[in-house]
Amino acid sequence: KATLSQKENIYLPSLAADLLEEISFEARQSEYIDEKSGVSARLSISALENLLSSAEQRLLRNNESKTTVRLSDFSSIVPAITGKVELVYEGEQEGAEFVANKLIDSAIKTLFEKNFPKIEKLEKQGANTPYDDLVTWFFNESKFEILNGISEKEYKKKLLSIEPLNKLLKEYHPEALK
């Protein structure tokens, strides 16, 4: 449960909330998780608490008054996942952390496909995709790095510097630019 301070100072984009929900769905369908034990609602609650705490730590470290939950904050929910699910033998063999990260990855992929055009494997030479400009941008950049601990202002500045990303977001997910 979010504290009053977290509610006032940390913006949780709807996409981040959807990702938390999708992680629970992925867990319920996972071959690594014991379906007899189920996936408790506590998983979502604990994951949200960890997610907000991660953002809050950054906010305090940077002496800022407001911040936004970032995708990189989702690494902080791994303990919430591993502590709230029971693994079957195959999951135990892979390891709890591996399974938790796999759930997060699968949830990201599912939401990506709901929000953006599917990434097709190119079979036709010269076929265009909505991602061509973005891929070209990254190939042409010698270095691009965003650290999770940087300030909100610097984080937005870095993301907004990727013009093909802005174009893609404007077309398919304009609320992300707000």
Label each region the model flagged.
Residues 36, 56-178:
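C-terminal engagement/docking regions of AAA+ P-loop ATPases
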